[in-house]
């Protein structure tokens, strides 16, 4: 897989521990960078956002639930709906404060406010970070499946994309990737 990623003009690294993964990504990123990050359980497990922030980077979660939690400085409460415990009234108040504009207390307005807030961050980002649902060893291909559009923007707009992928996501062939994804 690593050779095939290199053949596609990418770089691949193997980390045995969370500390090693954070170190590798930290060395690739450096400091004083603007980063947009798509939801990734692997990145969450290794506390990547916090590590990159400690290195002096500005890191923005782009998943709506993760963004809410980042702004509240809270941890996820659920794997699929990380901010399910936060009432929409609290989200409207939070967004109004952070975004310096009145955000109505309805979900559609809150989503629109988050989209507007993140748009500039996508465009200005130096680096986009994501996970991947599946990685194909024979082609070096990554499958990133999403439902909000944030992963597409996080991986496609910044000039650099870093994917943090656990070994359990690696399958031997592209054909098998389609079956598993």
Model-identified regions with their sequence ranges:
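The feature marks the mature, well-folded catalytic cores of soluble enzymes
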Residues: 1-181
């Amino acid at each position: 897989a690593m050779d095939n990623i290199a053949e596609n003009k990418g770089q691949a690294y193997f980390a045995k521990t969370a500390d090693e993964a954070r170190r590798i990504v930290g060395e690739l990123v450096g400091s004083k960078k603007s980063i947009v990050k798509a939801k990734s359980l692997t990145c969450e497990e290794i506390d990547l956002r916090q590590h990159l922030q400690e290195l002096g980077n500005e890191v923005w979660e782009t998943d709506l639930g993760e963004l809410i939690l980042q702004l509240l400085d809270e941890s996820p409460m659920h794997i699929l709906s990380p901010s399910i415990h936060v009432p929409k009234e609290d989200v409207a108040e939070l967004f109004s404060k952070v975004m310096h504009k009145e955000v109505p207390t309805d979900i559609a307005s809150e989503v629109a406010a988050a989209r507007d807030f993140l748009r500039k961050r996508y465009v200005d980002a130096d680096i986009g970070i994501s996970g991947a649902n599946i990685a194909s060893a024979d082609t070096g291909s990554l499958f990133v499946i999403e439902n909000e559009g944030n992963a597409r923007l996080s991986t496609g707009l910044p000039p650099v994309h870093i994917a943090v992928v656990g070994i359990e996501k690696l399958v031997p062939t592209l054909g098998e990737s389609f079956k598993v994804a």
